Every structure is written in C-alpha cells, then in structure tokens.
Curated annotation (Swiss-Prot):
Active-site feature positions: D11, D130
Pathway: Amino-acid biosynthesis; L-histidine biosynthesis; L-histidine from 5-phospho-alpha-D-ribose 1-diphosphate: step 5/9
Gene: hisF
UniProt record similarity statement: Belongs to the HisA/HisF family.
Protein's UniProt name: Imidazole glycerol phosphate synthase subunit HisF
Molecular function GO terms recorded: imidazoleglycerol-phosphate synthase activity; lyase activity
Organism: Chlorobium chlorochromatii (strain CaD3)
Subunit structure: Heterodimer of HisH and HisF.
C-alpha cells in the first residue's frame, strides 16, 4: 500500500505566509523561511509554495523567495503562481523547485501542461484545480478563484490527466479556510475517475478531517495550512493519528 502524504501549504503574498477563508480575508501566518524550516523538521512529506496573487496580478513568482526556501528544506518542493510558460517553469526548477503547479495558465493554454511534461516529465507537473459548487455542478475557477470557467471539475481533471499532468491539487473554494473538512464528494468523484494522484485541499480543521479525506475522499495526499501554521496540531501528531486508524504514512 502506498503511503499517504501530509503536505503543508505556504500561501504567500507580499513576502509573508497568509491564510484566508474562501479565498478572502487573508491574515498573516508568519515568516516564509520560519514556516519552511519548521515543516522540514516536522516530518512533512512535501511542501507546497503558492504565490497566491501572482496570476491575479499578472506577475511572476518571486524566484529569490523560492531559492531561499529550497535551500532550507530537504523534502520535495512544489512551487506555483504565475507560471505561464516552459521558460518560467525552467527558472523555477533552476531555483530549487522539484515540481511546478499550474492553474490559471493551464486553463488559458491547456497544452502548457504537455509542453512542461514533455521537457521535465509528468512527475514534475501538478495541476491545481480550484472548484466551487454552482447549482449542482462543481465548476473550475481561475485567477485565485475570481473567475469562473466553462469547465466542470471532472471534465477538467480528465483533460489535464490526458495532457500529461502527474498530479492534481484539488481545492474546494467552498471549504477553504473554514475548518469544516474536505469536500469529500467532489474529491471522491475525481480521485476514483483518474489514475494520477489527487491531493485534497480546502477545509482541514482537525485530524479526523485528514482521515476522512483519505477514507471518504479517496485522496492520495492531504494538504493543509491553518491547522499546522497556527500549531493546532503537528505533522507528527497527524501521522500518529492516521497510523493508529490504519492509514499508511511515512515516519
């Protein structure tokens, strides 16, 4: 059985880690480097660094910040935000990222996924999918959740898999920052339909929510921010809890 992964996420804006609710109302959650060092020492399986305003503001992720984080951590580092070309992905890799996450740019130019995957391998390409329930449909949103697209979540997930994505980071905008648990219906729908790993994101408020993301949502990994940033739980506590409940995790 493949071990399930626990992945803290650094949402970065203006050089600081921030956290909001439903993609709004951001509050400060500490220093980028302090949080990165903490998670590197905390048994995190990977670390995600998302410049959450890069696409919205039509700018690029700060490479200097990426490099500083990569020098501090010895776990896989995924970087996203404003990556809209193979050349930009190359720069991010050269500054220490192990994977790149594309979101808005992939919706605007789906074959960007293929171009990056062909050059660096599918394992290096994470497609972040931000979804919100509209009526009875889960719709994909871009530009930090500000713009709705024509894609339904499952349709887009299958498409990015076909184009060469190695992993999907699925965030429920409805649950983001609420601490009410992952949106396991959409998570299960997509996890069981694709053959690439799916990372659950948006809503983790306690350790049972992590367990539910794996058991009910069929996720391959669980991403969380608030519960770890503000030290409600440690990564070790999360893994010990999951292990006791029969979930395979790495220590």
């Amino acid at each position: 059985m493949l071990a399930k992964r626990i992945i803290p996420c650094l949402d970065v804006r203006d050089g600081r880690v921030v956290k909001g609710i439903n993609f709004e109302g951001l509050r400060d959650a500490g220093s980028i480097l302090e949080q990165a060092r903490f998670y590197n020492n905390e048994l995190a399986d990977e670390l995600v660094f998302l410049d959450i305003s890069a696409s919205l503001e039509s700018r690029r992720t700060t490479l200097e910040e990426v490099m500083k984080v990569s020098e501090e951590v010895f776990i896989p580092l995924t970087v996203g935000g404003g990556i809209s070309s193979v050349e930009r992905a190359r720069e991010v890799f050269l500054h220490g990222a192990d994977k790149v996450s594309v979101n808005t740019a992939a919706v605007n130019d789906p074959y960007l996924i293929s171009r990056i995957a062909e050059k660096y391998g599918s394992q290096a390409v994470v497609v972040a999918i931000d979804i919100k329930k509209v009526g009875n449909h889960y719709m994909v949103h871009t530009h930090s959740g500000k713009q709705i697209t024509q894609y339904e979540a499952l349709e887009w997930a299958l498409k990015v898999q076909e184009l060469g994505a190695g992993e999907i980071l699925l965030t429920s905008m409805d649950r983001d920052g609420t601490k009410e648990g992952y949106e396991n219906n959409s998570l299960r729908m997509i996890s069981t339909a694709v053959h690439i790993p799916v990372i659950a994101s948006g809503g983790a408020g306690n350790l049972e929510h992590l367990y539910d993301g794996f058991s009910k949502g069929c996720a391959d990994a669980a991403l969380a921010a608030s519960i770890f940033h503000f030290r409600h739980y440690s990564i070790r506590q999360a893994k010990e809890y999951l292990h006791k409940r029969g979930v395979a995790v790495r220590f």
